[in-house]
Amino acid sequence: VNPHPNADKLRVCTVDIGGRDKEIVCGGSNLYRGEKVVVALPGAMVKWHGEGDLVEIKESKLRGVDSYGMICASSEIGLGDLLPADGDHVIADLANFDCKAGQPIAEVLDLDDIILEIDNKSMTNRPDLWGHYGIAREISALYNLPLVEIPEFPKTEQGDLDVRIGDEERCRRYLGVEIDGLYVKEAPYKMQNRIWKVGMRPINALVDVTNYVMLAVGQPTHAFDSDNISDYITARRAKDGEKLVLLNNEEIELCSDDLVIADSQGPVGLA
């Protein structure tokens, strides 16, 4: 990684693409010697800075220096949600992946997969099929195939979590589990990858686990920080004009038709 002779914000990189080197000019802010990066060679299609239409990479001269490809940010190859960047002009750093120079990125990230889309409009009467495990169980029964059972955790002592139902007509059952000793960190990549493949965005281990459970067994779940829950948690109708801040920090105004999860201070989530 060398300075560009004519541009302070650019670097001239010699990149091993598998048995041969390519000189590529790059403006990534996180470049370092020995970094594992994603390279688009001439002919590849990318989204410049992750925006607009796809453009074809060509050999070019950038501020007087020849460049034979592009070192990519994750958003430029459609992987911004799977490999989120920490800031602007940050390229995808594959330091945490076991890969070698020249290996296809789809292979490195386990993207070369087959995804089956199952339209469940015709089986709304079968909520047991709304998750991956339900479909697997059905296929197992139809074709007499072995089914891997989901292990059960042993029951523990009853805690002091106060869970209530404030609208039994619209919510017949609402359960809570309190888990101690957790902290926020990234989920394992395998979990993030599976969540991303079905169109969801990985967030962190706690959020991803709840979404993973929903996708696996069809049961929606949500994690709350017990330090932020006052007195109890309940499923009830919202009051007209109540406000709720969503996970994306967007504030919405609720009406009495909305079903919410709330504590003694007000709504903490949409049901």
Predicted regions and their residues:
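Phosphate-backbone binding interfaces of nucleic-acid-interacting proteins
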Residues: 1-153
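Glycine/proline-enriched, intrinsically flexible loops and inter-domain linkers
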Residues: 2-5, 11-13, 143, 147-243, ...
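Short acidic-glycine loop/turn motifs at beta-strand connectors
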Residues: 17-20, 239, 263-266
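A structural connector/turn signal
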Residues: 26, 248-249
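Residue "hotspots" at secondary-structure boundaries inside conserved domains
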Residues: 29, 252-253
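Loop/turn positions that initiate beta-strands
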Residues: 34, 203, 257-259
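A generic structural signal for residues embedded in beta-strands
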Residues: 39-41, 254, 262
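Catalytic nucleotidyl-transfer cores of nucleotide-processing enzymes
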Residues: 256-270
